[in-house]
Every structure is written in structure tokens, then in C-alpha cells.
Swiss-Prot record:
GO terms for biological process: chaperone cofactor-dependent protein refolding. The keyword Membrane does not apply. Heptamer of 7 subunits arranged in a ring. Interacts with the chaperonin GroEL. Together with the chaperonin GroEL, plays an essential role in assisting protein folding. The GroEL-GroES system forms a nano-cage that allows encapsulation of the non-native substrate proteins and provides a physical environment optimized to promote and accelerate protein folding. GroES binds to the apical surface of the GroEL ring, thereby capping the opening of the GroEL channel. PANTHER family: 10 KDA HEAT SHOCK PROTEIN, CO-CHAPERONIN GROES. SMART domains: Cpn10. Belongs to the GroES chaperonin family. GO terms for molecular function: ATP binding; metal ion binding; protein folding chaperone; protein-folding chaperone binding; unfolded protein binding. This is Co-chaperonin GroES. Its main location: cytoplasm. The gene is groES. Keywords: Chaperone, Cytoplasm. One of its GO terms (cellular component) is cytoplasm.
């Protein structure tokens, strides 16, 4: 991937959607819910504060994160799906 996010943006590779229910039934594509977690694959340099100071990013590449259902912008690069979102759209880091 050759994407480099700007400012306080983060690129996330969403986790794959569930294929089956707990009971073993296959879920059709129209019934699948989008996952709300994924892995950070790139981060921008940070946000510039009003006083001109660069604020460091709190997330780093490789971290698993939890984000909102409608967070980010979906993009497809080289056949792979990604989300580009602001760091503030991330709710938590999963350990």
C-alpha cells in the first residue's frame, strides 16, 4: 500500500465481516454488518494545535482499534478495502 495520511488521519484495515451465525447459518452479503474494529496500517504526523504546536498521534501502526459504525471514508486500493478516518473517530485501542 502506498497511502500516507495527512494531519491527524489514520488508515485502518477493517476486520472481515462474520460469514456465519453462532448457530452455523451462512449470512448473505446483504445481512452482514460492517465490523467496527480493525488494524491501523498508517498514521499521519499529527494535528497542528491553534498555537502552531504539532500534537503527537496516540495510535500507532499495528494497533487494533474500535471505531464508530459510520466512521471514516471507505477506499479501495490495489483490491484491498481501507477506512481513512480522523484519530478522534477512534473510540479505543484493543489490547
Amino acid at each position: 500500500m502506498n497511502l500516507k495520511p495527512l494531519a491527524d488521519r489514520v488508515i485502518v484495515k477493517p476486520a472481515p465481516a462474520e460469514e456465519k451465525t453462532k448457530g452455523g447459518l451462512f449470512i448473505p452479503d446483504t445481512g452482514k454488518e460492517k465490523p467496527q474494529y480493525g488494524e491501523v496500517v498508517a498514521v499521519g504526523p499529527g494535528k497542528v494545535a491553534d498555537n502552531g504546536q504539532l500534537l503527537d498521534m496516540q495510535v500507532t501502526v499495528g494497533k487494533k482499534v474500535l471505531y464508530g459504525k459510520y466512521s471514516g471514508t471507505e477506499v479501495n486500493v490495489e483490491g484491498e478495502d481501507y477506512l481513512i478516518m480522523r484519530e478522534s473517530d477512534i473510540f479505543a485501542i484493543l489490547d
